[in-house]
């Protein structure tokens, strides 16, 4: 069991220990979050944070890098094996920096890029106007259809019209299988590069719970802390040697300076764990749990975007289902110790800070041992709360139920 920490800085100590209590007592349903292993916590909190070393293994601008070179090479080789790729850069601090580096390796400022819109489940870095991707590039978007699915014929039509240099596939709130082969065909037809952002589904991909883009994408990017259950950060991959050189240059010195070796160590330990048979068992359960979770909401009368899920997440339209916004739903559920995030839905009429939906994910609580029955129970608790948004007495009863559940499923340390 992870113990409370003691620091001379009592204000930070209290905040960390309060967060420990929150993580233990709340049902964590944010799809982009997970609970790392004790080994990964140790690696990230190690003395590697003291070491600086711009450059790449055996090509550093600083001395004393022989040990961090070992760590970085381990992370690289393990990622190659997991994703079946030839080249990997494990240095990106975050998914946003990784996407910036990946796009820059494929396009020049002012070139056209094409990605899924934010409301349809895309990410800020896929061309949203307030992001670098919408500021430095001529960004265009495609949408899901009225049923919440990608329509590849429509995507091809848009691609022919806007003639993108880069097409981005892979999303932050899309609950269905992505057909990377079809995206490759679209990219080839319009002469575009294909960038696959698999940040949400990477863990599913390496365990054969989702098709891999390694055969089709020119460049692949993933964060390492979602379904991969590794340290926070990102990696960029390719099978093209020339693109690999460009990627390396854009990561360093393009967008970053010295690597975070403690974070790279955490990535390496997470990749080691992902290579074990138990990780396959875990990801299988993540998908089973998500399917049952979605089905239970539908049985209880909720409107689930696309009618279900094929992966680790689902989107519930709370505006049409319960007459409340995603923001209010997030607040209600937070008060009964269920943590979710408000999320836009396709064709949303509410703003991104209000939204009509909530996004739910199963990876974190599956790590804590939840199986199908627990997710069915949590769905029922959530629906009771959302149907009665102002019944504070009921909310207290439901919170007590949640606390009894979380007591049985401790954090993984």
Swiss-Prot record:
The modification N6-(pyridoxal phosphate)lysine is found at residue 226. Its cofactor is pyridoxal 5'-phosphate. It catalyses: (6R)-5,10-methylene-5,6,7,8-tetrahydrofolate + glycine + H2O = (6S)-5,6,7,8-tetrahydrofolate + L-serine. It is found in: Cytoplasm. Pathway: One-carbon metabolism; tetrahydrofolate interconversion; Amino-acid biosynthesis; glycine biosynthesis; glycine from L-serine: step 1/1. (6S)-5,6,7,8-tetrahydrofolate binds at residues 118, 122-124, 242. Transmembrane segments: none annotated. Gene3D superfamilies: Aspartate Aminotransferase, domain 1, Type I PLP-dependent aspartate aminotransferase-like (Major domain). Its EC number is 2.1.2.1. The keyword Cell membrane does not apply. Its main location: cytoplasm. The record marks 225 as: Plays an important role in substrate specificity. One of its GO terms (biological process) is glycine biosynthetic process from serine. Belongs to the SHMT family. Catalyzes the reversible interconversion of serine and glycine with tetrahydrofolate (THF) serving as the one-carbon carrier. This reaction serves as the major source of one-carbon groups required for the biosynthesis of purines, thymidylate, methionine, and other important biomolecules. Also exhibits THF-independent aldolase activity toward beta-hydroxyamino acids, producing glycine and aldehydes, via a retro-aldol mechanism. Homodimer. This is Serine hydroxymethyltransferase. The gene is glyA.
């Amino acid at each position: 069991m992870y113990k409370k920490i003691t620091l001379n800085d009592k204000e930070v100590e209290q905040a960390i220990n309060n967060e420990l209590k929150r993580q233990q007592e709340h049902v964590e349903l944010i799809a982009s979050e997970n609970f790392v292993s004790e080994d990964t916590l140790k690696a990230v909190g190690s003395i590697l944070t003291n070491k600086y070393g711009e450059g790449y293994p055996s090509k550093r601008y600083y001395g004393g890098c022989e040990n961090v070179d070992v760590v970085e090479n381990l992370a690289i080789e393990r990622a190659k094996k997991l994703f079946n790729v030839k080249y990997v850069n494990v240095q990106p601090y975050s998914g946003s920096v990784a996407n910036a580096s990946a796009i820059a390796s494929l396009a020049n400022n002012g070139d056209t890029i094409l990605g899924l819109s934010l409301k349809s489940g895309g990410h800020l870095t896929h061309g949203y106007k307030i992001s670098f991707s919408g500021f430095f590039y001529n960004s265009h978007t495609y949408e899901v259809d009225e049923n919440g699915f990608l329509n590849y014929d429509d995507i091809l039509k848009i691609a022919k019209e806007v003639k993108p240099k880069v097409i981005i596939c892979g999303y932050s709130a899309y609950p269905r299988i992505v057909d990377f082969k079809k995206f490759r065909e679209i990219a080839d037809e319009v002469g575009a590069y294909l960038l696959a952002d698999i940040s949400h589904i990477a863990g599913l991909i390496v365990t054969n719970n989702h098709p891999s883009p390694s055969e089709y994408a020119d460049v692949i990017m993933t964060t390492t802390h979602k379904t991969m259950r590794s340290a926070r950060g990102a990696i960029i991959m390719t099978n093209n040697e020339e693109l690999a050189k460009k990627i390396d240059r854009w990561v360093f010195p393009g967008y970053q300076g010295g690597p975070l070796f403690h974070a790279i160590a955490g990535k390496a330990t997470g990749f080691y764990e992902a290579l074990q048979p138990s990780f396959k068992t875990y990801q299988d359960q993540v998908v089973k749990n998500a399917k049952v979770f979605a089905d239970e909401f539908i049985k209880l009368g909720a409107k689930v975007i696309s009618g279900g899920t094929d992966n680790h997440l689902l989107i519930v339209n709370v505006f049409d289902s319960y007459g409340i916004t995603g923001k209010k739903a997030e607040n209600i559920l937070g008060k009964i110790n269920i943590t979710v995030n408000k999320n836009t839905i396709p064709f949303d009429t509410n703003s991104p800070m209000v939204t009509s939906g909530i996004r739910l994910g199963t990876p974190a609580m599956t790590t804590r041992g939840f199986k199908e029955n627990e997710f069915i129970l949590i769905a029922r608790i959530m629906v009771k709360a959302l149907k009665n948004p102002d019944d504070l007495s009921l909310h207290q009863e439901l919170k007590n139920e949640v606390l009894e559940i979380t007591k049985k499923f401790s954090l993984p340390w």
